[in-house]
Amino acid sequence: TATLYIAPTSTIGTVFYRVMYNDPLPGCGDGNSNNVTVTVSPDISITTQPTGLTECADGTATMTVAVTGGSGAISYQWQVSPDGTGSWDNATGTGSTTTTYTPPSTVVGTRYYRVLINAANSGCDQAITNVVTVNITPDLSITTQPTPIIECLSGTSQLHVVTANGSGTITYTWQTSPNGTSSWTNASGTGSATPDYTPPSTSTGVLWY
């Protein structure tokens, strides 16, 4: 019955409102206002949490978040922290204000990320994702190069390589060439997909690996 009315917002959905007016003095008449709608939307709900990742320096892996609910335009702000518990700063890089983010990968180390999600219209609570870890590791490198072999027929000498760093499972494929510069093909024999390879020695000659 007042000139200002605060519509209930406890029930999700759309309700139509109007105000009726009446002047008790004779001849002043009565009537009603235009109809207006009040739409109550559910709060933002995170349906897909971002997943942490481990990659080599200069990688381009992405993290993604998805939500439902909210009212009006939904905004996203990825944030980064050195420890995941203390201070948070707005992140930089491709997609830092979108649902899909590519964290910087030029600096080796561990950093922690989360996303702040807000709806443009009033009344919707801010949503914050879980904290995820991003590990940037040094690129794969060879610390021990294979060395040449000179052996007799039916010898069992091995070629050996040692690697360091990298991310995930390291795979090895030994290759052979008749001249060391071209026509490289995958080698066969014991250990051809491991760090320790025993090249075939059933015929004389020189091969490159």
Task: Tell me the role of every PLM-derived stretch.
Residues 1-9, 80-105, 176-200:
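Surface-exposed, flexible coil segments in extracellular/virion-facing regions
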Residues 53-59, 149-156:
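Short, solvent-exposed loop/linker segments at the N-terminal edge
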Residues 22-29, 118-125:
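Short, solvent-exposed loop/turn segments at the edges of extracellular beta-sandwich modules
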Residues 39-45, 135-141:
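Extracellular interdomain linker/stem segments of modular secreted and single-pass surface proteins
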Residues 18-19, 65, 78, 114-115, ...:
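Core motif of extracellular immunoglobulin-like domains
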Residues 69-80, 164-176:
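Solvent-exposed loop segments of extracellular immunoglobulin-like
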Residues 59-67, 155-164:
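A short beta-strand segment in extracellular, disulfide-stabilized domains
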Residues 47-52, 144-148:
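Surface-exposed, proline-enriched loop/turn segments that connect beta strands in immunoglobulin-like
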